[in-house]
Amino acid sequence: MTLKELLVGFGTQVRSIWMIGLHAFAKRETRMYPEEPVYLPPRYRGRIVLTRDPDGEERCVACNLCAVACPVGCISLQKAETKDGRWYPEFFRINFSRCIFCGLCEEACPTTAIQLTPDFELGEYKRQDLVYEKEDLLISGPGKYPEYNFYRMAGMAIDGKDKGEAENEAKPIDVKSLLP
């Protein structure tokens, strides 16, 4: 080993210790999570929930568009129908161990039943616990759209009433009439 190699080695050791000393007093970037709140952007996409309409009924009509739009196939559901003709999911299941939180299911939902919340604490010890059923996903409120009701907006027929007899609905137009 030459004197030059010895001085270069000693210089790198001194430089390393100097850098450690500089970084020891620098401001920390690590957040102490439970004590310090985490900043979430306004459009953060977290846990998926199923919402209710203003009347308290489930918004989901089991159209299956969310399952078709999901790129990883983590949503599964089965349609059922009530006595008054309203559709609802008999079961609704999301596997959060596969979900990539892309938000395509929320965009595809015509009833705004599926909504992504800013909740990000989904840690579990067993993978089976990340499969959420309808009871786990359904919340008591309307979520982001408190006044929206799919059955009122879509003009779905109401049992016992003809078209045009429902609340705030105009009578149907007779297209064969010559009257203005």
Swiss-Prot record:
It catalyses: a quinone + NADH + 5 H(+)(in) = a quinol + NAD(+) + 4 H(+)(out). [4Fe-4S] cluster 2 binds at C70, C99, C102, C105. GO terms for cellular component: plasma membrane; respiratory chain complex I. It is found in: Cell inner membrane. One of its GO terms (biological process) is aerobic respiration. [4Fe-4S] cluster 1 binds at C60, C63, C66, C109. Residues 50-80, 90-119 form the 4Fe-4S ferredoxin-type domain. HAMAP family: NDH1_NuoI. NDH-1 shuttles electrons from NADH, via FMN and iron-sulfur (Fe-S) centers, to quinones in the respiratory chain. The immediate electron acceptor for the enzyme in this species is believed to be ubiquinone. Couples the redox reaction to proton translocation (for every two electrons transferred, four hydrogen ions are translocated across the cytoplasmic membrane), and thus conserves the redox energy in a proton gradient. NCBIfam families: NuoI (TIGR01971), PRK05888.1-1 (NF004536). This is NADH-quinone oxidoreductase subunit I.
